[in-house]
Every structure is written in structure tokens, then in C-alpha cells.
């Protein structure tokens, strides 16, 4: 399973981590990867344009940047 930021099985950890199907909770993300975690998406911005958000996604419908709409809950 290489889907979660901050996990020992993540393909790329740290500042370069970019998870395709992030399912991590905000508390599970590494400090350097936090801004790229779906659970950390808020205030109309998605941390990762390619993410597919899990249950912890805080994005509301229509709030995400155009490049992240496919990955945002509600859009």
C-alpha cells in the first residue's frame, strides 16, 4: 500500500511526498508532507492537485481549485 503520506510504506515521504490516493488523517502526515495531504485541505485550497480525498477531506463543493476538482469531496 503506497497510498498514504507519512506511512512507512509511502512511495515518497517528506517534502517531496505526493500521494495519488491519500487516505491519511491530518495527524498521520509527516510535517514535511502535511500540506500535500488531503486531510489538510481547507480554506478553498487542496493540498495536492492530483489527490483523491478520503473521509477526512474538508473541501466543500465548489471550493477547490480547478486542478483539484476531480479529487475533492463534494465536487
Swiss-Prot record:
One of its GO terms (cellular component) is cytoplasm. It holds the Pfam family Metallothio_6. Induction: By cadmium. GO terms for molecular function: metal ion binding. InterPro entries: Metalthion_4_echinoid/annelid (IPR017980). Keywords: Cadmium, Cytoplasm, Metal-binding, Metal-thiolate cluster. Disulfide bonds: none annotated. It is found in: Cytoplasm. Residues 42-75 form a propeptide. Posterior alimentary canal. Its main location: cytoplasm. Monomer. Metallothioneins have a high content of cysteine residues that bind various heavy metals. Binds 4 cadmium ions per molecule. This is Cadmium-metallothionein. It comes from Eisenia fetida (Red wiggler worm).
Amino acid at each position: 500500500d503506497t497510498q498514504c503520506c507519512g506511512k512507512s510504506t509511502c512511495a515518497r515521504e517528506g517534502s517531496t511526498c505526493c500521494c495519488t490516493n491519500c487516505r491519511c488523517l491530518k495527524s498521520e502526515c509527516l510535517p514535511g508532507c502535511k500540506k500535500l495531504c488531503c486531510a489538510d485541505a481547507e480554506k478553498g485550497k487542496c493540498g495536492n492537485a492530483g489527490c483523491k480525498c478520503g473521509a477526512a477531506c474538508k473541501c466543500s463543493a465548489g471550493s477547490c481549485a480547478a486542478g483539484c476538482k476531480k479529487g475533492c469531496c463534494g465536487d
